Regions:
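Conserved phosphate-donor/acceptor-positioning beta-strand/loop module used by diverse small-molecule
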Residues: 104-110, 118-136, 148
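A conserved segment at the C-terminal end of the G1
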Residues: 25-36
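Short glycine-/polar-rich loops that comprise or flank the Walker A/P-loop
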Residues: 36-38, 120-124, 140-144
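Conserved glycine(s) of the Walker
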Residues: 18, 23
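Extreme N-terminal, non-catalytic leader segments
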Residues: 1-13
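ATP-dependent small-molecule kinase phosphotransfer cores
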Residues: 43-104, 111
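NTP-dependent small-molecule kinase module
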Residues: 2-4, 138-177
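Hydrophobic packing residues within well-ordered alpha-helices of enzyme cores
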Residues: 31, 116, 135-136, 159
Length: 177
């Protein structure tokens, strides 16, 4: 093993979860600007492509039958139904990035994060909550870290720190903010 390998943090999946309106996407944009090597999976969906979306960039657009085939084959790490459409995270590209040593940041809702925990118990779950709100105790216990989104810069900096962390998560939950 080289010195470079020893200095590099072990690749890990970090799930940034929060309720609708918590600002997950804003935080992810700020994190990507600070930590360009982090990989953010492109979600798969059965909804039609909208202009100016490009297949494989903003979303991977799948026919409903293809989505079902991938679910049956275990190729979706997690998935959900939103209205008449489905969306999910393709597992093979995510696994390939982790196996290659790349840090992965996956923004999801709380339900999606819990589904990831079942399939990948070593994933680091980070709960993002809006200012002035406290997470439900039952929800908070599933997460290693809780961040209050009162300042996108601060939250992004803390998340970048977690992404670069080589140590395992503490057994206790941290509430910041």
């Amino acid at each position: 093993m080289s010195t470079d390998d020893e200095a590099r943090p072990a690749a890990r999946l970090t799930v940034l979860a929060g309720p609708s309106g918590s600002g997950r996407e804003s935080v992810v944009e700020f994190v990507r600007a600070r930590f360009p090597s982090v990989w953010v999976p492109v979600p798969a969906t059965t909804r039609p492509r909208r202009e100016p979306e490009v297949d494989g960039e903003q979303r991977v657009f799948l026919a409903p039958a293809e989505f079902e085939r991938r679910v049956a084959a275990g190729e979706l790490l997690e998935w959900s139904r939103i209205g008449e459409y489905r969306r999910g995270t393709l597992h093979p590209p995510l696994r390939a990035r982790l196996d290659a040593g790349q840090q992965v940041l996956l923004p999801l809702d709380v339900t999606g994060a819990r589904l990831v925990r079942v399939r990948l118990p070593d994933a680091r779950l980070v709960l993002l909550i809006p200012p002035g709100r406290r997470p439900d105790a039952a929800v908070a216990t599933a997460f290693a870290h809780t961040l209050t989104h009162d300042c996108t810069d601060r939250v992004a900096d803390e998340l970048v720190g977690l992404l670069g962390s080589t140590h395992p998560d503490p057994a206790w939950s941290r509430v910041r903010g």
